[in-house]
Amino acid sequence: KQYSMKKSIIIMVLMAFTNIAIAKTLVTLQQLQGKWQCTEDIYKVNTETWTFKKASFIVENKYVYRDKVDTSKYEIFYYLSKGVPNVYDGSKVGKIGSGTHIIYYAKRRKKILSYEIVSLKGDTLTLSQFAPRAIGRNAGIVTITLKRVSR
C-alpha cells in the first residue's frame, strides 16, 4: 500500500512538471508590440513599463531608493523563437514573426537569456524566466505579469 502511494505521488509530480513545460503560448510580433505595465508592486512606488517594438523592447523603472525617486531605462534587442537556442543569432532580431520565447543577449554576462511566454490573454501578458541566485534571492523561476497600456 505504501509503495503505491509513493508511486502515485511521483506520477502526480511528473504530470505537474509536464503541464508546466507545455504551458507555452505562441505569440506574434504584432501581438507583443505596444506599451505594457508590470502588475506586481514590488516596491511601494515602483512603476515598471515595457515597450515592445519590432526589434527591441525598452524597460523603464521608476522607484524610490533612500527616500529619493530614481529612474532607469534600458533597451534590449530580441527575437522570437519556438524554443531556447544554444547560440544567439542577432540576424533574427525583428525578423521572426512568432514564437514561444523572447530571446536576447545579455552583453555584460555574455550569455543568451530568454523569457518564456506563458500566456497572452486579452491585455494580460505573462512571462517567466529562470533567475540565477542573487543577493537576497535563491535561484528559481520568476513570473512577470504585464497589462497592456497602449498599442
Whereabouts are the PLM-identified features?
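Sec-dependent N-terminal signal peptides
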Residues: 8-17
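Residue-level recognition of conserved beta-strand positions in structured domain cores
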Residues: 61-62, 129
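Contiguous, well-ordered beta-strand patches that form the walls/edges
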Residues: 41-45, 62-122
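Edge beta-strand at a domain terminus
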Residues: 24, 71-86, 124-151
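N-terminal targeting signals for Sec/Tat export/insertion, comprising classic cleavable signal peptides
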Residues: 34-58
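N-terminal helix-cap/turn-to-beta initiation motif at the start of protein domains
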Residues: 22-37, 150
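Generic beta-strand structural signal
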Residues: 31, 51-54, 80, 96, ...
